[in-house]
Amino acid sequence: MRKYIAIIIASLALFTGQAHGQRCLPKMQGIEVRADMADGFNLGGKDGGYSFGAALSTYTKKGNKWVFGGEYLLKNNPYKDGKIPVAQFTAEGGYYFKILSDARKIVFVYAGASALAGYESVNWGEKVLHDGSTLHDRDAFIYGGALTLDVECYVADRIALLANLRERCLWGGDTFNFHTQSGAGTNFLIH
């Protein structure tokens, strides 16, 4: 009789539905670390751009999430035989909606909107260029928003790889208002 009970228990354990990790539950938090290319990235070129950022993401009902963080973006603008760096330091607050996920809760696709505010520095505040020309663009406080398409792929219960595509629009500065970013990152779930 014990043998039959053991066989029934083993068969129930093997043939019933699988248990999956509990992900994106309300109030779960994660630390996101990202690296992006900005407006295309030409290795060794004069017009490449990149950004680095970190954020705290807090999940809500239905797998949506709030994201609060900071970002550093550097874009080099070509000028004669050199380049003029434009750096942006921004803080972000936004809400991302889960638009797609698989049944096993491994891959999530989010679409989100964020408010951005920060500071822009043109040529690190130096007005005179290397050839004696005067730069009329100035350092300024900037504000605006961003639209983001974000993909999370869980490789473990507390670690997810990120891929994102983002369009930033910022006003208040003297340089370009729009920046397209694409990149990758990691999300470490802490709670």
Regions found by a protein language model. Name each.
Residues 1-28:
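Cleavable N-terminal export/targeting peptides
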Residues 20-75, 187-191:
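Short glycine/proline- and aromatic-enriched beta-strand/turn motifs that initiate or cap beta-hairpins
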Residues 23-31, 62-66, 87, 105-111, ...:
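Outer-envelope beta-barrel architecture signal
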Residues 52-53, 70-72, 76-78, 120-121, ...:
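Outer-membrane beta-barrel domain signature
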Residues 55-130, 159, 188:
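Gram-negative (and chloroplast) outer-membrane scaffold detector with strong preference
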Residues 92, 178-191:
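Outer-membrane beta-barrel "beta-signal"
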Residues 148-151, 156, 160-163:
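Surface-exposed extracellular loop regions of Gram-negative outer-membrane beta-barrel proteins
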